[in-house]
């Protein structure tokens, strides 16, 4: 996959390069049968891919990869024969020639750099070169040591902004131009020529030449530089500056590399990087022959430039072959990685040491080894960064194909194109740049973002479905694959892929933007740098979008964050572009960040969408497609980003409202649903209930928040279950401070809201990395925390704690969404209200008594209790519990199911807040389960919870414990059927006295809960599951998360 990704990506770069590799010779690239064919195939695939990834995220990616393989591998092989390493595929189009030409690559690379790819490669090359200081030192040393190097570096590093601004004419080019002209032209140009990279330094020629890659090959170095200088190159340079600065190797590589700016541009520009790695690396590889590199620059530049239209391979293979085979090979890995995935480019930048070192390794290996080694190395490099790999793969699907589509549709892409997108689509972007850099880039961004969004959604679902290892603890993981929270939960690990899925596009774009910081970077430095941080401070989601875009998008290279800033600045400049690209970019970075801050971006965004509407996921895709999320989510427009990312992506919620609400956690309804829940709760709101209701409302906000952390439905349940401010606070913390998610997870566990933590953790676990932490915490606290902590969280009420246990059982049933367990769920959700029905009890025949039923439901509810009850309980119940547990396990795996059950358990209250799940669930419920004989034993179990309600708070969940509770449960159960939310809280209202509070409700609802469980059992079996589904849905405020969880 990595190699394929590389190939695919390379193919993308190649295609792009073929299409746009040289402003001067786009036709010749198109004429490349491989690139043209690939172009066709990719362009045909791209539009489909936009839509396809949703349906077949994996298969589409693989199809694209296969296409890329089929198209690129043969071509690569052919060119590998030309001593173009497979990595040259991307390079091969743009970079390969540049990279292959490696030091000629300045021209070749520049030519390609002229197209984004070269710049990107150059960056890689630079990183690589830097990394390959030994080989690179030869030339880099020259570059570095040489005045030109110093000068170039000086320019790049010293005045990246000036560079940008100077070159300002083309935005990206402006940077390169300023830098090149200033450094390259004046001081570096001569030295630059001396240097292989100096040629790049010769930005005077290069600058003009760079964009017109074909243009002045006379100063091959200049040409190369020119490419670097050229928009993408310039952008790359700017970014390269950032990268160079950030990545000393990059800087060094840039300076040293014939493309000081170009290299820088490459570093910045993924396009440039792609080529530049070849160039730089070629330099590195050729660095041994510094003169050779230079010669390559000149010779290859001229030859390659001429050849480039014909084919990168010819360029690479031929002119560069003597030195370039290794250079190519060296560049290959880099280029491949670089072009293969822009993420890698960032990696190269960020991981200049590691990635560069790897490349260095490859530089040495590749330099000496055959191009095939490059493929291996590329594969290794790709493998080196899983996220990078994903980036490659995703980029292929999202970015590469999108770019190819751009190649096919320069105008539409142009419309979307953003200067920032250059880095994302270095190959095609640079080409696009040549064709119509801004517009095309914009189009590319949009297409990529849309396609990335679609692909992201598909892959996200894919990942979410297979993200149980991320969701490890929750059954919800799979069921929640619909849920943004789960996705984000997965995003910690899986969503890295998702991030990478988008990252390549947005990353390329970002790097391009950052690299072509001339437009973006100046603003990026001022606006983007702080904008990103502003986003960070302003909104975690935005921060994720911004900082994470930089860091996360630079999943491979955190160094890219400055670049990202610049790019974002560029994106900011191009609202459309940024918005278009950002959704994938944000997603990618958020996904990547999800490992650290899963909620920062993706969680809020996805969860909001998914929390509130089953179609919200589609909304998310649509938002992405519609650039709702991408536009606003992207940092291009921080305010819009916050607003739409949260508002439009959620669909129902305003992102700002969501974020603020999440932070407030209960200040105002996050969404209509939250409002609805709130209204329902408020109906029965009393002091405690008010809090509880508030918590639930907050929980709905937590739906958004929990979306981040725990997904709306679960948060709703969680809130219902916890119905406690601590839980809400935790959710608020998690959501309000996405950055603090990890902290919050511990906090939740530490908060003493163990149950909140546990429940939330269970949900969290389902929904986000914070949930993971929570679920871990919950797992830790699960038994006791769920019961006691949960109780303690909301109400120090032991009843609440007991309710929590019942809740766990009920929730477990819900979670299991098993008809058998739906019993418990239904009992909790529907039957619970109907619990008073003796017939239900009888029909459940759990003991003919609600206590027996409750006992059964209780045991089902509490995982821990289940264990105890299994021992204590009759084999039939044990079997049922085992069944439920098994279902739970099947849903989320043993760990997830146990954690989920322990944390959330089968929370009837989640289904039906009225259910005394809160007070009901108790670790002691084993005894309560044990005393199937009567409510009293359950009361014993409820002793903690029932301490308050020794009366009817019998073991029976909702049957006899509190008659009004029981009746209310029936009443509420019906209400819940009609309006789950209103019923839930009305239920609390019904139990308006002490039971009015959610906790009391739980008490009163304990019996009702038992009946509810019984009812659920019977009803579930009798087809009441649908009602429970309705209840869950209504409780979750229409959130499908309940079902998904179940």
Swiss-Prot record:
Record has Phosphoprotein as a keyword: yes
Modified residues (Phosphotyrosine): 855
Disordered as annotated region, ranges: 1-455, 469-894, 908-1046
Principal subcellular localization: cytoplasm
Biased amino acid composition, Basic residues: 964-976
Skewed-composition ranges (Low complexity): 952-963
GO CC terms in record: cytoplasm; mating projection; plasma membrane
The UniProt record lists the keyword Cytoplasm: yes
Compositionally biased spans, kind Basic and acidic residues: 81-96, 430-455, 529-538, 586-597, 621-630, 773-782, 868-890
Residues bearing PTM Phosphoserine: 41, 303, 363, 491, 561, 671, 857, 1005, 1034
Coiled-coil parts of chain: none
UniProt subcellular location: Cytoplasm
GO biological process, one term: regulation of cell shape
Biased amino acid composition, Polar residues: 98-149, 175-191, 228-301, 327-341, 389-408, 420-429, 488-498, 548-559, 570-582, 742-756, 792-802, 837-855, 922-951
Disulfide partners: none
Keyword entries, A-Z: Cell shape, Conjugation, Cytoplasm, Phosphoprotein
Biased composition annotated in UniProt, kind: Acidic residues: 605-619, 1006-1019
Quaternary organization: Conjugated with HUB1. HUB1 has not the classical C-terminal Gly residue, so it is still unknown how conjugation may occur.
Function: Polarity-determining protein which forms a conjugate with the ubiquitin-like modifier HUB1. Involved in bud site selection and cellular morphogenesis during conjugation. Required for survival during stationary phase.
Name listed for the protein in its UniProt record: Protein HBT1
Organism: Saccharomyces cerevisiae (strain ATCC 204508 / S288c) (Baker's yeast)
Lineage summary: Eukaryota, Fungi, Dikarya, Ascomycota, Saccharomycotina
């Amino acid at each position: 996959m990595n190699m394929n990704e590389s190939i695919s990506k390379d193919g993308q770069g190649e295609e792009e390069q073929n299409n746009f590799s040289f402003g001067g010779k786009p036709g010749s690239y198109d004429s490349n049968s491989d690139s043209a064919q690939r172009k066709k195939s990719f362009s045909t695939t791209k539009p489909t891919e936009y839509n396809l990834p949703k349906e077949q995220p994996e298969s589409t990616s693989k199809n694209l990869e296969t296409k890329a393989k089929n198209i690129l591998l043969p071509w690569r092989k052919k060119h590998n024969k030309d001593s173009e390493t497979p990595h040259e595929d991307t390079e091969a189009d743009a970079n390969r020639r540049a990279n292959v030409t490696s030091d000629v690559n300045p021209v070749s690379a520049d030519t390609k750099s002229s197209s984004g790819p070269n710049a990107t490669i150059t960056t890689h090359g630079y990183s690589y070169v830097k990394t390959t200081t030994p080989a690179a030192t030869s030339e880099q040393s020259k570059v570095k040591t040489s005045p030109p190097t110093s000068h170039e570096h000086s320019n790049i590093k010293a005045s990246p902004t000036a560079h940008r601004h100077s070159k300002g004419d083309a935005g990206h080019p402006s940077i390169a131009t300023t830098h090149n002209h200033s450094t390259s032209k004046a001081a570096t140009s001569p030295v630059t020529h001396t240097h292989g990279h100096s040629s790049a330094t010769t930005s005077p020629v290069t600058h003009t030449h760079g964009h017109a890659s074909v243009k002045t090959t006379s100063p091959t170095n200049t040409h190369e530089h020119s490419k670097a200088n050229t928009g993408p190159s310039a952008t790359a340079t700017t970014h390269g500056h950032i990268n160079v600065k950030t990545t000393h190797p990059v800087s060094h590589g840039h300076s040293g590399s014939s493309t000081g700016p170009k290299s820088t541009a490459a570093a910045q520009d993924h396009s440039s990087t792609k080529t530049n790695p070849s160039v730089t690396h070629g330099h590195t590889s050729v660095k041994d022959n510094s003169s050779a590199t230079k010669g390559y620059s000149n010779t290859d530049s001229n030859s390659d430039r001429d050849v480039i239209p014909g084919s990168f391979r010819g360029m690479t293979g031929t002119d560069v072959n003597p030195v370039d085979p290794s250079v190519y090979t060296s560049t290959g890995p880099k280029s491949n990685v670089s072009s293969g995935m822009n993420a890698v480019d960032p990696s190269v930048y960020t991981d200049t040491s590691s990635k560069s070192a790897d490349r260095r390794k490859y530089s040495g290996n590749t330099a000496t080894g055959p191009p095939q080694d490059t493929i291996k190395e590329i594969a290794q490099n790709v493998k080196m960064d899983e996220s990078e790999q994903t980036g490659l793969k995703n980029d292929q699907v999202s970015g590469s194909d999108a770019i190819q589509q751009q190649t096919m549709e320069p105008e539409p892409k142009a419309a979307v194109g953003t200067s920032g997108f250059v880095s994302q689509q270095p190959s095609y972007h640079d080409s696009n740049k040549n064709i119509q850099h801004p517009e095309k880039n914009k189009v590319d961004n949009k297409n990529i973002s849309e396609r990335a969004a679609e692909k992201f959604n598909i892959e996200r679902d894919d990942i979410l479905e297979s993200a149980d290892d991320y969701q490890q603890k929750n059954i919800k993981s799979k069921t929640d694959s619909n849920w943004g929270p789960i996705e984000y939960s997965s995003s910690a690990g899986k969503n890295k892929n998702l991030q990478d899925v988008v990252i390549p596009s947005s990353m390329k774009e970002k790097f391009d933007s950052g690299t072509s910081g001339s437009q973006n970077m100046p603003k990026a430095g001022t606006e983007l740098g702080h904008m990103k941080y502003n986003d960070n401070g302003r909104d975690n989601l935005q921060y994720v979008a911004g900082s994470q875009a930089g860091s996360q998008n630079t999943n491979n290279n955190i160094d890219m964050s400055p670049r990202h800033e610049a790019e974002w600045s560029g994106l900011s400049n191009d609202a459309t572009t940024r918005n278009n690209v950002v959704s994938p970019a944000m997603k990618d970075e958020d996904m990547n960040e999800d490992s650290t801050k899963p909620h920062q971006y993706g969680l809020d965004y996805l969860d909001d969408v998914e929390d509130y509407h089953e179609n919200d996921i589609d909304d998310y895709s649509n938002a992405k497609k519609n650039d709702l999320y991408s536009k606003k989510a992207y940092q291009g427009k921080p305010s819009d980003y916050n607003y739409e990312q949260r508002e439009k992506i959620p669909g129902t919620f305003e992102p700002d409202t969501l974020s603020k609400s999440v932070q407030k956690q209960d200040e105002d309804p996050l969404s209509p649903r939250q409002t609805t829940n709130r209204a329902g709760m408020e109906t029965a709101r009393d002091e405690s209930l008010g809090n509880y209701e508030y918590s639930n409302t907050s929980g709905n906000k937590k739906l958004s928040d929990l979306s981040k952390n725990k997904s709306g439905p679960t948060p709703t349940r969680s809130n219902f279950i916890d119905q406690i401010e601590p839980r809400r606070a935790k959710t608020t913390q998690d959501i309000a401070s996405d950055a603090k998610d990890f902290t919050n997870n511990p906090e939740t566990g530490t908060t003493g809201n163990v149950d909140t933590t546990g429940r939330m953790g269970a949900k969290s676990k389902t929904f986000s990395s914070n949930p993971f932490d929570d679920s871990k915490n919950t797992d830790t606290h699960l038994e006791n925390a769920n019961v006691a902590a949960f109780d303690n969280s909301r109400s120090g009420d032991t009843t609440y704690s007991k309710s929590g246990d019942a809740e766990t059982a009920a929730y477990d049933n819900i979670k299991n969404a098993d008809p058998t367990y739906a019993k418990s769920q239904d009992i909790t959700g529907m039957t619970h209200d109907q619990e008073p029905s003796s017939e239900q009890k009888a029909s459940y025949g759990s003991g003919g008594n609600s206590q027996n039923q409750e006992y059964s439901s209780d045991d089902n509810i509490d995982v821990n209790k289940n264990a105890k009850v299994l021992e204590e309980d009759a084999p039939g119940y044990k079997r049922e519990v085992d069944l439920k547990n098994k279902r739970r396990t099947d849903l989320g795996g043993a760990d997830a199911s146990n954690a989920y059950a322990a944390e959330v358990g089968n929370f009837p209250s989640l289904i039906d807040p009225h259910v005394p799940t809160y007070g009901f669930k108790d670790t002691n419920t084993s005894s309560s389960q044990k005393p199937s004989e009567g409510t009293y034993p359950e009361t014993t179990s409820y002793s903690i919870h029932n301490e308050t309600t020794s009366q009817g708070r019998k073991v029976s969940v909702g049957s006899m414990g509190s008659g009004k509770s029981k009746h209310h449960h029936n009443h509420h159960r019906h209400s819940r059927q009609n309006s789950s939310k209103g019923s839930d809280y009305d239920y609390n209202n019904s139990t308006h006295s002490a039971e009015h509070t959610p906790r009391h409700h739980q008490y009163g609802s304990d019996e009702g809960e038992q009946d509810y469980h019984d009812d659920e059992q019977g009803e579930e079996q009798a087809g009441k599951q649908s009602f429970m589904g309705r209840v869950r849905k209504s409780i979750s405020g229409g959130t499908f998360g309940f079902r998904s969880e179940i």
